[in-house]
């Protein structure tokens, strides 16, 4: 009974924990630890004996939760915060539901539905995470270089999980990729834009990087053109607002 409803109970618990903390402003560490344990327990119940095969995915899920929580904390409007929390929990329920179907038919040769969705799940939550990191640098004066390292590690972890074992990518590819995203994070940080825009710019290039690598360099011109236009538009609009 509990196993079959775990994908519903976990999002409800996350939402309850967020609402209680936002209302009382107490017990931050306790609620974070309980929520992380809830995610791990749900992952175990959902994946069964395949839990350790997907340990990198579960690590990314924990990072995703921390990024979401930090993002919600930096929202000043209470209505936006609670509404965002509800939407995020609906997404968690959908992810667990898809994972339940994925592991139920684990030996099926093709499980493209969840694997395709996971890319967008990671992209969205990377935006939460990166935007939160930029805000922490600005408002809490956290060390820039440590956060660069943290973002690069998260990008590497998500990309590694998305590529899986099907693509044999050498150390040179990963070294150049890590160096590229470290540069992008640093360059975007020094632009006169909000942390929302900064996070969007980095995530756009992460999406292009993932799409290009997973699609075996097919149909490259379309995505790169759209991302370049979006990058230019975001920069111009942000500078216009500032000036």
Language model: regions and residue ranges:
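Hydrophobic alpha-helical segments and helix pairs
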Residues: 64-129
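Structural signature of hydrophobic alpha-helical transmembrane segments
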Residues: 22-39, 80-94, 136-151, 192-204
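Final/C-terminal transmembrane alpha-helix of multipass membrane proteins
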Residues: 223-243
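Cytoplasmic-side transmembrane-helix entry/capping segments in multi-pass membrane proteins
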Residues: 52-64, 84-87, 109-122, 168-177, ...
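C-terminal ends of transmembrane helices
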Residues: 40-54, 96-111, 155-167, 208-219
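Alpha-helical transmembrane segments
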Residues: 3-19, 34-39, 57-69, 122-127, ...
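Intrinsically disordered, low-complexity segments enriched in Gly and acidic/Ser/Thr residues
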Residues: 161-204
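Hydrophobic alpha-helical membrane segments
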Residues: 38, 61-66, 178-181, 197-212
């Amino acid at each position: 009974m509990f196993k079959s409803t775990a994908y519903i109970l976990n999002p409800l618990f996350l939402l309850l924990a967020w609402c209680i903390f936002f209302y009382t402003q107490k017990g931050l560490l306790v609620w974070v630890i309980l929520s992380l344990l809830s995610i791990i327990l749900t992952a175990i119940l959902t994946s069964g004996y395949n839990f350790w095969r997907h340990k990198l995915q579960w690590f990314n899920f924990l990072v995703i939760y921390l990024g979401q929580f930090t993002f919600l904390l930096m929202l000043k409007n209470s209505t936006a915060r609670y509404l965002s929390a509800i939407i995020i929990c609906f997404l968690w329920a959908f992810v667990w539901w898809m994972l339940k179907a994925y592991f139920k038919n684990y030996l099926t040769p093709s499980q493209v539905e969840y694997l395709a969705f996971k890319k967008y799940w990671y992209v969205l939550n990377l935006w939460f995470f990166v935007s939160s990191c930029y805000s922490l640098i600005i408002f809490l004066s956290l060390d820039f270089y440590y956060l660069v390292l943290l973002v690069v590690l998260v990008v590497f972890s998500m990309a590694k999980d998305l590529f899986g074992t099907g693509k044999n990518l050498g150390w040179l590819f990963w070294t150049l990729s890590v160096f590229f995203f470290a540069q992008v994070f640093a360059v975007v940080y020094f632009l006169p834009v909000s942390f929302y825009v900064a996070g969007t710019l980095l995530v756009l290039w992460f999406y292009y990087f993932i799409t290009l690598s997973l699609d075996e360099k097919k149909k490259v011109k379309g995505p790169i053109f759209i991302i370049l236009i979006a990058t230019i538009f975001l920069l111009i609009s942000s500078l216009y607002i500032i000036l």
